[in-house]
């Protein structure tokens, strides 16, 4: 039995591109993101590709939003064939001894804690008789410290370990999990990085953009697709799109 695929952060960038690739491959997609005009656009595009798709507004920084979204998903679908945990935020881009505590906490909540909360609330819909593939979107920042990105680095490192734990504990429940780093992609996150004047490496990222080194979200999504739907990739793997 094939169920729906849940993609978080699906209103734009990599998330929207992955959601569209999955829907175009013939699967219903649940697109999750904060309420916005972009989410509405994504919903219309997905409906044209697969009429059983759905968009749900949800802020992964808000536990009540996560609970409400999980309830809607459970009321409309019986099984999730896959989850793509793509939602994330780069900020705060600040020295870790100067950053506001609330901003740092929100980054950890959105990038890491919300992943566990949402997945846990959907536990009755994943694995068991039918396989579920969980993919988390990783980053090079999970492997090395980037100045002024402390919250993002910590969250992404934690997300990699979360994925490994899910791979270990989910295997007996017919769940496989893996993480994929997309490389440097032309998204709104990159726009925010290039605008961060106090970021020590800002000129590096401006150069990536000006010299055309950024990947297009659609190209990255095509590489992600076979892993998201379980046709490629092993349980517990961590991959980089640039090596595929």
Task: State each model region's role.
Residues 11-12:
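Conserved glycine-rich cofactor-binding loop
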Residues 25-41:
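Conserved glycine-rich Rossmann-like NAD(P)H-binding loop of the short-chain dehydrogenase/reductase
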Residues 94-96, 100-105:
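Substrate-binding pocket helix/loop in short-chain dehydrogenase/reductase
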Residues 119, 155:
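Active-site helix of classical SDR
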Residues 126, 144, 165-175:
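Active-site-adjacent segment of SDR/Rossmann-fold oxidoreductases
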Residues 139:
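Residue(s) in the substrate-gating loop at a strand-loop-helix junction
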Residues 179-182, 187, 196-244:
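C-terminal helical subdomain
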């Amino acid at each position: 039995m094939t169920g729906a695929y849940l993609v978080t952060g699906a209103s734009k960038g990599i998330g929207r591109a992955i959601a569209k690739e999955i829907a175009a491959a013939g699967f219903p997609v649940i697109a999750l993101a904060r309420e916005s005009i972009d989410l509405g656009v994504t919903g219309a595009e997905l409906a044209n590709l697969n009429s059983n798709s759905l968009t749900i507004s949800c802020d992964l920084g808000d536990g009540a939003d996560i609970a409400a979204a999980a309830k809607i998903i459970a009321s409309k679908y019986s099984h999730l064939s896959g989850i793509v945990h793509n939602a994330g935020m780069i900020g705060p881009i600040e020295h870790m001894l100067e950053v506001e505590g609330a901003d740092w906490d929100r980054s950890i909540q959105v990038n890491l804690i919300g992943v566990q909360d949402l997945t846990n609330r959907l536990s009755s819909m994943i694995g068991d008789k039918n396989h579920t593939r969980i993919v988390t979107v990783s980053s090079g920042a999970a492997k090395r410290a980037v100045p002024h990105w402390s919250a993002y680095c910590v969250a992404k490192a934690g997300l990699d370990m979360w994925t490994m734990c899910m791979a270990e504990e989910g295997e007996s429940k017919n769940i496989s999990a893996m993480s994929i780093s997309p490389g440097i992609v032309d998204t709104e996150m990159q726009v925010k990085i290039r605008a961060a004047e106090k970021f020590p490496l800002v000129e590096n990222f401006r150069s990536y953009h000006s010299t055309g080194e950024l990947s297009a979200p659609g190209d990255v999504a095509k590489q992600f697709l076979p892993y998201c739907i379980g046709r490629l990739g092993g349980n517990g793997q961590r991959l980089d799109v640039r090596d595929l």
